[in-house]
């Protein structure tokens, strides 16, 4: 299991939301590329980068920051938020983004999902499954899809998806701990390489996730707020897992 630091971009700043609420966001840095550099120095190999403006269909707002992060860090970057057409995929491929995260498009545009798989390969396509009370949320977590996450996971198996990020939105940004039961269920029921996201507050949370007794082990875990609030030491976390 790998530890994956996160940067969520809103208006070119690194922010964290509370339970996905844009009205409850906290700004941590106006120079997010410096955060990425510090993550690399502390031993991270992969960065989870989210364009929150893009997720709400406010396209292009964070492009300068995304490009600067890509140009200044040695980290591999997986990027999501607003990837809803072939042109955006092609642009991010051109600037060197390593993995593309599709959330809304994976629910509403299966043709684009197939296109991404066919043209960029299964290792570079990740689907974000973001759920609140079991129902998948889309469009920056602001709209209900009407689909239970289990039904979406079944679709993704049939589509040939291998990598997912699963977020329990009710835990995200709360530092209240991860939803262990949800991850236990998914890892025992589906063949995905799963990245856990939401609620991580301590090294104990990471250890609890890494020690789940499941058919498939977690591929990775995303942490953001715990790093920014000083509750989790990235270098120690990486060396401990």
Swiss-Prot record:
Annotated EC: 5.3.1.16
GO biological process: L-histidine biosynthetic process; L-tryptophan biosynthetic process
One CC-aspect GO term: cytoplasm
Keyword Isomerase applies: yes
Keyword Zinc-finger: no
Protein family (similarity comment): Belongs to the HisA/HisF family.
Name of this protein: 1-(5-phosphoribosyl)-5-[(5-phosphoribosylamino)methylideneamino] imidazole-4-carboxamide isomerase
Gene (UniProt): hisA
